[in-house]
A protein has these predicted regions:
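Cleaved targeting-peptide boundary
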Residues: 23-29, 182-184, 334
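Outer membrane beta-barrel
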Residues: 24-46, 50-177, 212-216
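Residues that define the transmembrane beta-barrel architecture of outer-membrane proteins
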Residues: 32, 51-59, 93-96, 148-152, ...
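Transmembrane beta-strands of outer-membrane beta-barrel pores
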Residues: 42-48, 81-85, 116-118, 174-178, ...
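Repeated loop/turn-to-beta-strand initiation elements of outer-membrane beta-barrel proteins
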Residues: 72-75, 106-110, 163-170, 216-222, ...
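Outer-membrane beta-barrel "beta-signal"
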Residues: 154, 312-314, 336-348
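Detector for outer-membrane/organellar transmembrane beta-barrel domains
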Residues: 190-193, 197-199, 204-307
């Protein structure tokens, strides 16, 4: 019998890039509920900038409604927006998620809108720490590629519960055609004027499939993502494995990827991510990760880095964090630096 694990899907959608979450329920009754959630964070450090400064990590606010419409079907809708509450201005809010979904214990779950993708269900198992996590999943064009959050996607997921501790899951995703416009700033001569380059990319229909299994706390998965960009087929294979629950005892995850025209348009790349973490009963969680991307044709490392991080849950909804990311070098002549930060995240 096909049985959808709604709790697992909710956790994958909401918590996979954070350590904890909470939401304030503002209405519940007659099979309908409405909740507001999200978090804000601040840190002090050298965080992907040249100087030590106060910064944010990835604050957001969301609103989610659920309605039981009978016959075992629950319809839900969610909107989530990233916050720029330190600088403000015209870009104080940016869309992260926006979808309507329907779930049934046997029939599975269908979602339409901007959402976390089935690809990410497999590829995101190491994308856990607050400050420094899996960067290659968020490379340029990731919304259109569907490598983490996927823009304007139709997805379907279901889980087969083989036994009390064995479950097999699969997911399908589709994105339609679109033309994406991007801008990039450069400074050919320093000092000199800033040059802004605008490029267009034509995305054909894209599809992805994800298959995974959980065997008494040990998970394995495979996902495939493909579709043309301009005249090239941009495709990606990801294999992952993970063990445990992040923040509770031992957690370990490995991600290996092989891409063609997928990561920043490079013809062939390999990508690697490894994470090991240990969560103590007193709320302390310690982790170390490693990540790199290699150009297979030139055998040149695009970037490589490793981070040591500590997160401490003071109380439910309040987490402090500190991390140091070591630059391990590249083979393409780009100047890179170590980064570090310490901060606090408040959930509401």
């Amino acid at each position: 019998m096909m049985k959808l694990n709604n709790l697992a899907i909710a956790v994958a959608s909401t918590l996979i890039a954070s350590t904890s979450a909470s939401a304030a329920q503002i209405y519940s009754g007659d099979g309908t509920s409405l909740a507001v959630g999200g978090y804000v964070d601040v840190g002090i450090g050298k965080y992907f900038e040249d100087n030590v400064e106060v910064h944010q990590v990835s604050p957001r606010i969301n609103i989610e409604g659920k309605k039981d419409i009978g016959n075992g079907v629950t319809v839900d809708a969610k909107g989530e927006w990233g916050l720029n509450y330190l600088d403000g201005g015209n870009t104080s809010f940016t869309t992260r998620l926006g979808y309507i979904g329907a779930s049934h214990d046997q029939a599975g779950r269908l979602v339409v809108g901007t959402q976390w993708s089935p690809y990410y269900d497999v590829a995101g198992v190491a994308d856990m720490p607050i400050a420094f996590a899996n960067d290659f999943l968020y490379a340029s064009g990731y919304y259109d590629l569907g490598s983490s959050r996927a823009e304007k996607m139709v997805s379907y997921r279901n889980t087969l519960a083989v036994s009390s501790d064995i479950a097999l899951s699969f997911g399908l995703g589709w994105q339609g055609k679109k033309t994406a416009t991007s801008t990039e700033q450069s400074q050919p001569v320093n000092p000199g004027p800033i040059v802004v380059t605008t490029t267009n990319a034509d995305y054909d229909n894209r599809g992805q499939i994800a298959i995974s299994g959980d065997f008494a706390g040990f998970g394995v998965g495979y996902t495939y993502n493909a579709g043309d960009i301009d005249t090239e087929n941009a495709k990606s294979h990801i294999v992952s494995a993970n063990f445990g629950s992040y923040g509770k005892g031992i957690y370990a995850a490995l991600v290996w990827g092989k891409n063609e025209n997928f990561y920043k348009g490079i013809a062939q790349t390999y990508q690697y991510e490894a994470l090991a973490a240990f969560g103590l009963d007193n709320g302390v969680n310690i982790s170390v990760n490693y990540e790199s991307v290699e150009d297979d044709k030139t055998s040149k490392t695009q970037y490589s880095q490793s981070a040591l991080q500590v997160e401490y849950t003071i109380t439910s909804g309040l987490v402090t964090f500190a991390g140091y990311q070591f630059d391990l070098g590249n083979d393409i002549g780009e100047d890179e630096e170590d980064y570090y930060t310490a901060g606090v995240r408040y959930f509401f």
